[in-house]
């Protein structure tokens, strides 16, 4: 990711779900599992905090899926490995798997869009050239990218059917968590990567200071992992769009149009105006999944609209920020059964059918960012403490600006609409 920021000093730490370990690194992963689950991963800021929607922050016009998570897209799985060691290591790995099979042998179409490219998104050029994923997506810390990629490639090559493979395009994204994490130690190891990959599951997704979000900072408060989804009404296709992201960036926090960061006195460039405040720099990795049958060109258009959701939260994608979106489709019609194979075949969406998906991804991205902030709790780490977003003052500001419970203002949906 981009530059580190100075910050007012937030986080939630979670534990990945247990899963059987496989492959040559399994014994190492099992040992790491014991170490991670024995570590003090409980929130440091007290009771668990609500998601944004549970607190009355309703974003947009479309309804979320049952989980309001990227895993509402059928088959998508998420796993976390949170790495906390002593007082200085606050980092981890988050793995996003597009389906239950082998990602190399059953490839999904994909696209990458760059808002500001101050980052190290490994594997991006091949995805942009060929328009497909051939590995899971990993998120981690900046100086852990290469170790994470090496571990994922070793894990993938050990899977059945991979005996003759001689080239793998590992996709690994990052943000710089060096305020709370001793990033120069590069603490993410192979066993952490394997634990994230093999614990990946459907169902609810842990948010806040978990996995790759353990040490991140957003808008000067504790950031982390956030997720959200939208389901289109049947007459608009009924497709699902899910977003998962790693928030670690700056700006002037805006929630449903309310100037939260300004009113709380925590915003970018305040140091220039008043000789204090948070930096504009930082990064965000946004992963978008959909079950809509769209190929790489349309996925690129979809990914670009995720950046509009980012902008709504108060980001201006500064010079030192790495702002990336990776989008993929899980639809069987557009998958490809390995090198040399053609897509399975079937109808894909026309351009005219994409606008509802654009609206959905903007809404899900915006809400996922809010979730990353709402779920985070105050975290102590390598170079200080980062405070969580203060919820009651934030909700008071939102109430004052009429930014809560927007769902009550939407006219009733017509019969048959979700």
Residue ranges of predicted features:
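Alpha/propeptide regions of enzymes that mature by internal proteolysis
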Residues: 44-418
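Hydrophobic helical h-region of N-terminal Sec-dependent signal peptides
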Residues: 29-37
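Compositionally biased, low-complexity flexible segments
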Residues: 1-24, 36
């Amino acid at each position: 990711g981009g530059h580190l920021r100075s910050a007012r000093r937030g986080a939630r730490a979670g534990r990945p779900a247990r899963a059987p370990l496989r492959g040559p690194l399994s014994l190492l992963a099992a040992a790491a599992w014991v170490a991670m689950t024995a570590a003090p991963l409980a929130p440091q800021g007290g009771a668990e905090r609500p998601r944004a929607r549970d607190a009355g922050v309703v974003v947009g016009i479309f309804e979320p899926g049952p989980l309001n998570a990227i895993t509402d897209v059928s088959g998508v799985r998420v796993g976390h490995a949170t790495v906390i060691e002593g007082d200085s290591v606050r980092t981890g790995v988050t793995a996003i798997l597009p389906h239950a099979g082998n990602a190399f042998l059953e490839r999904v179409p994909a696209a990458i869009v760059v808002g500001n490219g101050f980052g190290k998104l490994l594997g991006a050029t091949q995805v942009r050239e060929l328009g497909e994923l051939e590995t899971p997506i990993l998120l981690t810390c900046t100086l852990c990218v290469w170790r994470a990629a090496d571990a994922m490639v070793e894990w993938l090559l050990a899977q059945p059917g991979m005996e003759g493979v001689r080239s793998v395009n590992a996709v690994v994204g990052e943000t710089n968590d060096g305020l709370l994490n001793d990033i120069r130690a590069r603490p993410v190891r192979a066993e952490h990567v394997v634990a994230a990959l093999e614990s990946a599951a459907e169902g609810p997704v842990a948010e806040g200071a978990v996995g790759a979000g353990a040490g991140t900072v957003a808008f000067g408060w504790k950031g982390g992992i956030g997720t959200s989804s939208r389901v289109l009404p049947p007459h608009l296709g009924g497709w699902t769009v899910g977003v998962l992201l790693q928030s670690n960036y700056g700006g002037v926090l805006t929630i449903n149009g309310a100037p939260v960061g300004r009113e709380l006195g925590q915003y970018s460039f305040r140091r220039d105006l008043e000789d204090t405040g948070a930096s504009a720099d930082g990064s965000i990795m946004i992963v978008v999944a959909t079950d809509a049958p769209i190929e790489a060109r349309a996925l690129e258009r979809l990914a670009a609209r995720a950046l509009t959701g980012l902008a709504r939260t108060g980001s201006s994608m500064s010079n030192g920020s790495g702002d990336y979106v990776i989008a993929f489709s899980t639809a069987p019609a557009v998958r490809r059964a390995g090198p040399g194979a053609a897509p399975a075949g079937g109808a894909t969406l026309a351009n005219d059918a994409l606008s509802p998906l654009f609206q959905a991804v903007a809404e899900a991205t915006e809400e996922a960012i809010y979730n990353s902030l709402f779920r985070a709790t105050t975290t102590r780490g390598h170079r200080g403490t980062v405070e969580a977003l203060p919820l009651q003052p934030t909700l008071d500001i939102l109430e004052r600006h009429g930014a809560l419970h927007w769902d009550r203002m939407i006219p009733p949906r017509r019969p048959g609409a979700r």
